[in-house]
């Protein structure tokens, strides 16, 4: 590792510890030439995940875009930000777990829908109205009725 101060190519590791919730390793180093200390981070170099849109276009999976969608759906709802971030992380992990480099946008959308249903029903309906492109109030009502029926079925099963 090159020293950021003198560019000497050798340094020794003084301390290593997990960082970023175990997704990286923080290393404290000391330069073998100038003696100055610096910090480096080591993380897995993940291959980009590509989302295939309905029209065939491809774009790189954007975690920030997914998070923004969740934040918008959950706006003014009693859903903790940490829970939203954990859910987004879980969706990304699920998408990567299949080992495929490309995923269909519909698969991402369904994971989001299922996750929002668990998080908050109002956020679910908000997202569904955009994702499913409700054209009128009847489409909206149909989705709410499906949600209510699902809740009744769950109550009956208990």
UniProtKB/Swiss-Prot annotation:
InterPro entries: ATP-cone_dom, NrdR-like_N, RNR_NrdR-like. Its cofactor is Zn(2+). Keywords: ATP-binding, DNA-binding, Metal-binding, Nucleotide-binding, Repressor, Transcription, Transcription regulation, Zinc, Zinc-finger. A zinc finger (unnamed) spans 3-34. GO terms for molecular function: ATP binding; DNA binding; zinc ion binding. Residues 49-139 form the ATP-cone domain. PROSITE patterns: ATP_CONE. Binds 1 zinc ion. GO terms for biological process: negative regulation of DNA-templated transcription. It holds the Pfam family Zn_ribbon_NrdR. PANTHER family: TRANSCRIPTIONAL REPRESSOR NRDR. Negatively regulates transcription of bacterial ribonucleotide reductase nrd genes and operons by binding to NrdR-boxes. Belongs to the NrdR family. This is Transcriptional repressor NrdR. It comes from Desulforamulus reducens (strain ATCC BAA-1160 / DSM 100696 / MI-1) (Desulfotomaculum reducens).
């Amino acid at each position: 590792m090159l020293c950021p101060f003198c560019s000497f190519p050798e340094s020794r590791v003084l301390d290593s510890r997990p960082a970023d919730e175990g997704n990286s390793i923080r290393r404290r180093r000391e330069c073998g030439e100038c003696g100055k200390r610096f910090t480096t981070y080591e993380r897995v170099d993940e291959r980009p995940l590509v989302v295939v849109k309905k029209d065939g276009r491809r774009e790189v999976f954007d975690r920030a875009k997914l998070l923004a969608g969740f934040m918008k759906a959950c706006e003014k709802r009693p859903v903790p930000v940490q829970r939203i971030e954990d859910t987004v992380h879980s969706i990304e992990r699920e998408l990567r777990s299949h080992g495929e480099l490309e995923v269909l946008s519909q698969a991402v959308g369904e994971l989001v829908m299922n996750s929002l249903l668990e998080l908050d029903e109002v956020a679910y309906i908000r997202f569904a109205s955009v994702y499913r492109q409700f054209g009128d109030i009847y489409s909206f009502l149909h989705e709410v009725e499906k949600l209510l029926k699902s809740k009744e079925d769950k109550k009956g099963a208990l």
